[in-house]
Each structure stands twice: as structure tokens, then as C-alpha cells.
């Protein structure tokens, strides 16, 4: 827009970007918004759950095509043949155990009934957190899970 100052907030994950948008105040000045948005983003950890498209060795893991993988804050967390086992291991991480808010975005390849099971898993394992399940509709990633 002509006459408007545009600032890019360098988020690294979709949940970080969402957190920045939630605190933006259209009535505040640019500096105030940048500070608030950057702070909001810094408090977000992200897990991304997907599958291996090919065999590979990465980060000490021998990954086979079709294995389920979890990335936590951009680093390979674990791989498992079973998605359920991977999620059970992921939910035990301090990132989620110490979270106040957890948002679970499920992808286009996840049935709502399966997403509900994942919600129950996180709700049982993280009783102190407020947990929200959302249809993200994202391709490739079964889940994107944010913890704040």
C-alpha cells in the first residue's frame, strides 16, 4: 500500500507466523508491533510431523522411505515406523510438558477421527496445557504442533 511502511517478521515456522499475527495491533505504531510480534514469535516451539520421501541417513538416524519423522524446532527429533509411537515419544518432550498452550494443526492426509486421537494423547500427557485442535489442511505434514 502506498505510503505504508512494511516490515517482515522473520518467522521460521507457520505456527510462529500465526503467533505474530495474533498480537498485531493495527492501531499501534510499527515499532510497537514489531517488538510485540517478535516477542510472541520467540515463545513458540514447533514440531512438524511428516514422512520420509526416500531412504537417507541424517543426524545419526537411518531413515527408510515411508518412515514417520518428527522435527522439533527445525531439528530431526526422531523417526518411527509407527506414527502413534512417534507422537507418544514427542508428547513426552519438555517442550510440550512445560507448555501453557498447544495448538495441533492436522494436515490434509489426516482424518478427523485420527486427529481426535492425537488430541486425546496430548490432553492426557499435558494436563496443564490449554490444547486446541485445528484442521490446517497442509500437504506433506501430518501435523504441525506449536507449544507456547
Summary of predicted features, one role per range:
Residues 1-148:
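N-terminal loops that bind phosphate or other acidic moieties
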Amino acid at each position: 500500500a502506498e505510503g505504508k511502511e512494511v516490515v517482515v517478521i522473520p518467522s521460521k515456522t507457520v505456527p510462529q507466523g500465526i503467533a505474530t499475527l495474533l498480537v498485531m495491533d493495527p492501531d499501534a505504531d510499527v515499532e510497537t508491533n514489531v517488538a510485540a510480534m517478535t516477542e510472541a514469535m520467540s515463545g513458540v516451539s514447533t514440531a512438524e510431523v511428516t514422512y520420509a520421501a526416500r531412504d537417507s541417513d541424517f543426524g545419526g538416524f537411518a531413515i527408510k522411505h515411508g518412515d514417520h519423522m518428527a522435527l522439533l524446532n527445525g531439528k530431526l527429533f526422531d523417526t518411527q515406523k509407527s506414527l502413534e509411537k512417534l507422537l507418544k515419544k514427542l508428547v513426552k518432550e519438555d517442550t510440550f510438558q512445560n507448555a501453557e498452550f498447544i495448538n495441533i494443526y492436522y494436515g490434509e492426509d489426516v482424518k478427523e477421527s485420527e486427529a481426535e486421537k492425537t488430541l486425546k494423547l496430548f490432553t492426557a500427557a499435558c494436563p496443564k496445557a490449554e490444547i486446541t485442535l485445528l484442521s490446517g489442511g497442509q500437504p506433506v505434514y501430518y501435523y504441525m504442533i506449536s507449544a507456547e
